[in-house]
Structures are given as C-alpha cells and as structure tokens.
Amino acid sequence: GAGFSHEAFGSQAVFRSALMALSHPGRCIPVEHDAELPRHGNAAAAVFLLAMLDADCGLWLSPSLRDSDAAMWLRFHTGCQLVEHAAMAQFVWVGAGDSLPVLQSLRQGSDECPDQSATCVVDVGSLSASADADAQHWTLSGPGIREQATLSVTGLPSDFAEQWAHNHAGFPRGVDLFLATHDQLVGLPRTTRIHTPVEA
C-alpha cells in the first residue's frame, strides 16, 4: 500500500494527534489519515509509526508483525532499520495478542538524556473512557490530567499496571507508551500514574 497521499501534510496530522495524546494522557484521540495500510497491525499504530520513523530509527516488531506486510511497508516508506532485540530499538510495536516486552528491558534513557528512551506502541482491542465489561479499568493522574481521567482497555497483559508503576517510578528515565486501536491513540507518558480499582 501507499503511504500518505501528501507526505508532509499526512505526517503532520498524525504527529498532531500523537502530541495531543501525550499532552492529555488517557484521552482517546481520533487518528485520521489517507494512507493505504498494511493488512497486519492496528491502523492507528501503523500511521503513527509511518509519521515518526526515518532512516535513523531502529524499530522492533513483535512476532506477529515481524514477518508481515507491515514490516515491509514501514521499511519501504520510512527507511527504518528493523532490529532483532527490543532493547536496541527507539520504537517498539507490539501486535495484538503478542507478549509485551518487559518495559524495564527497553531503552530507558538517562537522567541527562531521558529523551533517548524507547517509545512503545501497543495494539489493543478497545479503548474507552467508560468502564467496559471484560476491560481493565483504570483511573489516571499526573501532568496533563485535570484531577483524574478514566480509561478502559482490552488486550493488555494482566500485569500491565504493575509494570507501568515500575516504569513511572524510574522518572526521568523510562519509556513513553501509546495504546492503539484502528482509529484511536491513547498516550501514556512516563509521568502518568495508573490507579487500579481496589479489590473488594
């Protein structure tokens, strides 16, 4: 498939959506684009990476994406380098149903250069501000959130909130993460705290 019909405008629109998602953690941000997408991987994740990657970027793909048309599509349109180990990558894309790498095993940046950390994009089944059945339901707090935000997610491992607590505790080091469906992104910068409901 083709990339954006107009590369600069297409990339800028997706970049603005991603910036909005990071500026307002937990908010479901619609992603609009006109790119012809690969068959594999969630569309919002694919166009996010299409906008962000270039020839200097290392990308790690989870097993279901590694040998798919998504890998060839991103390499062709961005020139990115596919890396074998997630710990080497600036960007990590985890397909639906694939195991999430341990967040602390990814590039964490340093106190002096926290921006040298990895950005992780995870395909999920659904994203919603309301409490959905069969979803993990969280309350979020931190910079960019007025008091609290709520988020329901399906398709993440059951220990994700615990992993995220370790990621948050390492600030200013740590990874920033995007959750992606076919048409929405949710940003989770490392400054965001996830609060899980207390079990009765």
Where are the model-predicted features located?
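Internal, well-folded beta-alpha domain core
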Residues: S68-G187, T191-A200
